[in-house]
Regions:
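Conserved active-site and cofactor/substrate-binding residues in soluble primary-metabolism enzymes
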Residues: 51, 67, 71-74, 110, ...
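His/Asp/Glu-rich mid-to-C-terminal helical/loop segments that flank catalytic regions of hydrolases
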Residues: 164-182
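Generic structural motif
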Residues: 179-227, 231-264
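Long, positively charged, glycine-interspersed low-complexity recognition regions
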Residues: 268-272
Length: 272
């Protein structure tokens, strides 16, 4: 059994080095860890390819004769094609804070039972949209690899506790699959959700965003989640109300919001 980790942080590199040094990788197993595919952009504090703003994660399966990002994608696909499991530390597509979770695309080959072994609070599955066919996760699954995207709470800020939860989830999965020897607690009994079942809350007005209810908090229908403040006079332009009972899955964390953008996502309460 071989496992590939595509990481967004050095903490994962250090942890792998520690595991290898202690001889905790089970005989006959192999772990490949790739810290990043885009060093130059990372050094310039950019997410996309620095020269043309193209997205590597919209370039798969890639073309070895194509553009820079397409060549990188093709090289990666060739390097990881024989691995049984693939884990990507991904960034949430909206700016903000979310409950840590693991996500799989619905390609017909996904296994939520395997995703539950990470022991994260939620397993999120999503329909495959047209642009998803050019992502790493989708193409990994199509190659026969069980591919997972692991999300910590934030991407653009340091959150030690959230990052520790994500790394622990991966170590837990590798332990349960018999790839490493590692003592870890059992984690969460994961709740499996479809991405389309998350209730989106949009801003009715533009202005300063004053968050009242944060992520992972329980809310009641009609409860005030946030206020949007007029930047000219400081008065409240609008109150953001919860459309349903549930738990806040995501909240945006920008001080300014535009009208009609998603500012909250709520897990609808399933049982009374």
């Amino acid at each position: 059994i071989r496992d590939c980790l595509l990481s967004r942080g050095l903490g994962d590199v250090y942890k792998r080095q520690e595991i290898e040094a202690q001889g905790d990788v089970v005989a006959g197993k192999e772990i490949l860890l790739i810290p990043t595919l885009n060093y130059s952009s990372m050094n310039a504090e950019k997410k996309k390819w620095i020269s043309d703003d193209s997205d590597i994660n919209r370039s798969f399966p890639g073309n070895i004769e194509g553009t820079a990002t397409s060549r990188i994608a093709a090289t990666l696909m060739d390097r990881v094609k024989d691995y049984t499991y693939g884990i990507q530390f991904a960034s949430f597509y909206l700016q903000g804070i979310s409950i840590p979770h693991v996500r799989m695309m619905e390609t017909g080959t996904e296994s939520t039972s395997l995703a539950n072994l990470f022991g994260m609070p939620y397993v999120l599955t999503g329909d495959t949209r047209s642009f998803d066919t050019a992502t790493l996760n989708y193409n990994w699954q199509k190659m026969g690899t069980q591919a997972f995207s692991v999300y910590s709470a934030t991407t653009d800020t340091l959150d030690g506790e959230s990052a520790k939860m994500a790394v622990s989830a991966v170590l837990r999965f590798l332990t349960r699959m018999g790839i490493i020897r590692y003592e870890s607690h059992g984690g969460y009994i994961s709740t499996t959700l479809k991405e389309k079942d998350l209730v989106s809350v949009r801003a009715d007005e533009a202005g300063f965003f004053r968050c009242i209810v944060g992520v992972n908090q329980e809310v009641k229908r009609g409860q005030v989640l946030a206020e949007i403040i007029n930047p000219m006079d400081g008065n409240i332009k609008a109150e953001v109300l919860a459309p349903t009972d549930g738990i806040v899955f995501f909240v945006q964390n920008s001080p300014l919001v535009f009208q009609n953008v998603v500012i909250y996502k709520i897990v609808r309460r399933m049982h009374q």
